[in-house]
């Protein structure tokens, strides 16, 4: 009888046990600081992860939350080196069992790029959530604290598993593959225009309205576990009166791949087409 009671107690304890969520901080506006609460100008990446966590003590009611400082930058300065560091740390934490979910605080300038990169290289179906803010931490009516609270709620929610890397801002949950920043200042900036959001989170209450069916994370073919660097890939935008010498310069600078963002339905200027074909013939 005692053994049965003990087993029941263990079972009940497992049901009420809080999940473990690790916050990996990289800086951004969510960690930004201004001279005053009404200052539009601020410096991104000024506050450490411990300060961000202490600012929202309620997250400890949702999960056992720990933080690590991976970087503290404005996300316009994001690098391949930080990407690899993030990817390897996320995979390490999720594989070890030390984390049931991951939250990454990030600047909004390149948040969607980091989210999609991780969507391709994370090898787990556990929740990985990127979160940012459009107003600095010292701003009047800062959006960061509630965004962080909601992001931890999403990462701790079992229904988030298997949806790939997620982006949470302004009460919305977006799939990394679809989301993009659409406005330079509005808190309602992140949108998935082709598919729409896949869920909502309202003061910690998580509700999914769609399922991410695209291949991602553990089903992705990409693996960076043995890589120390990523190859250089450049983006070339097309425009009227375009020149092909930009492509030639990129090849000389060591570009290993070129993405051409064409006009209309991917159209390429004749002069650029010549240099792109030459680049391709050279192995780019």
Where are these regions (language model features)?
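ATP/NTP phosphate-donor binding region
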Residues: 18-92, 274
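Sec-dependent N-terminal signal peptides
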Residues: 4-13
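Accessory alpha-helical/coil subdomains and C-terminal extensions
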Residues: 18, 24, 48, 55-56, ...
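Internal gly/pro-rich beta-alpha loop/helix module
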Residues: 131-203
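Short acidic, glycine-rich surface-loop motifs adjacent to enzyme active sites
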Residues: 96-111, 253-265
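Short Gly/Thr/Asp-enriched flexible loops that form oxyanion-binding sites at enzyme active sites
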Residues: 104-126, 268-277
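A glycine- and small-aliphatic-rich helix-loop capping segment at beta-alpha/alpha-beta transitions
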Residues: 37-46, 110, 116-129, 144-150, ...
